[in-house]
Curated annotation (Swiss-Prot):
It comes from Brucella canis (strain ATCC 23365 / NCTC 10854 / RM-666). InterPro entries: RpiR-like_SIS, SIS_dom, SIS_dom_sf, SIS_GmhA/DiaA_subfam, UPF0309. CDD domains: SIS_RpiR. SUPFAM superfamilies: SIS domain. This is UPF0309 protein BCAN_B0929. Belongs to the UPF0309 family. Signal peptide: none annotated. Residues 30-214 form the SIS domain. It holds the Pfam family SIS_2. NCBIfam families: PRK02947.1.
Length: 242
């Protein structure tokens, strides 16, 4: 490794080690909410804009993932249809309600809202929408970053039932480069994916113990075709992305 790649690995590993202990109670609370939704045949929706939408894709139709998970995906809040436009769109009040209306979020569901800054209009609106519908809210955000830039604005962390603080610094990037004021090496994705997969693994373990764990297999594993087809048929009525 070069010096800077070594620093990046060390930073991410140190943050993950700290999160494992510091977030233990909050992760257990998040798993409680998701497991309760699974037992009641409810759904767990995952919403994020910009790069945060990758969390929704990560948990959707995933080998080793839960079939109760529904990603909220729309080109206008993602990056592939125009990154600059998407960054503008996520700041417009009222813009995401029509997107959320397509999914049928209801009482007993869970909405995971992912936003590193936790202050843009889209994640705030998503959390308020979930509250209106009677769904529980899990926020994955950077508390430090959000507190730094809030300046009186509503913060996602104030609207959630459970807050998962990803420990990303303000601005996300962690590596200074000699001779430059710029930083590189964003960490929020690596930290966020690890946190959410750990929570969902906890939920899966509980459901296995209770005899009903709707877990997808990798498409290349023996027997995966029948298992995955059965899960798709069971859950596709409330997941438009299957």
């Amino acid at each position: 490794m070069t010096e800077i790649t070594d620093r990046y690995f060390n930073d991410v590993i140190a943050r993950l080690s700290g999160l494992r202990d510091r977030l233990a109670a909050q992760m257990e609370k998040a798993a409680d909410l998701i497991a309760a939704a699974a037992r009641a045949d409810r759904r767990v929706y995952v919403f994020g804009t910009g790069h945060s939408h990758m969390m929704a894709e990560e948990l959707h139709y995933r080998a080793g993932g839960l079939a109760i998970t529904v990603p909220i995906l729309c080109g206008s809040i993602m990056l592939q249809d125009g990154a600059v436009a998407s960054s503008h769109f996520e700041r417009i009040e009222g813009a995401v309600r029509p997107i959320l209306d397509r999914y049928g979020i209801r009482d007993g569901d869970v909405l995971v809202v992912v936003s590193n800054s936790g202050v843009n209009a889209a994640p705030i609106e998503a959390a308020r929408y979930a509250r209106e519908k009677g769904a529980a809210i899990i926020a994955l955000t950077s508390v430090a970053y959000s507190n730094t830039i809030a300046r009186g604005r509503t913060q996602l962390l104030s609207l959630a039932d459970v807050v998962l603080d990803n420990d990303a610094p303000s601005g996300d990037a962690v590596l200074e480069i000699a001779g430059s004021a710029l930083k590189v090496g964003p960490v929020s994705t690596a930290l966020g994916v690890t946190i959410l997969n750990a929570v969902f693994a906890d939920v899966a373990a509980r459901l296995v113990g209770e005899g009903d764990a709707p877990i997808y297999l990798s498409a290349n594993m023996p027997g995966s075709g029948d298992i995955n087809r059965s899960l798709v048929e069971r859950y596709r009525d409330r997941n438009p992305h299957l």
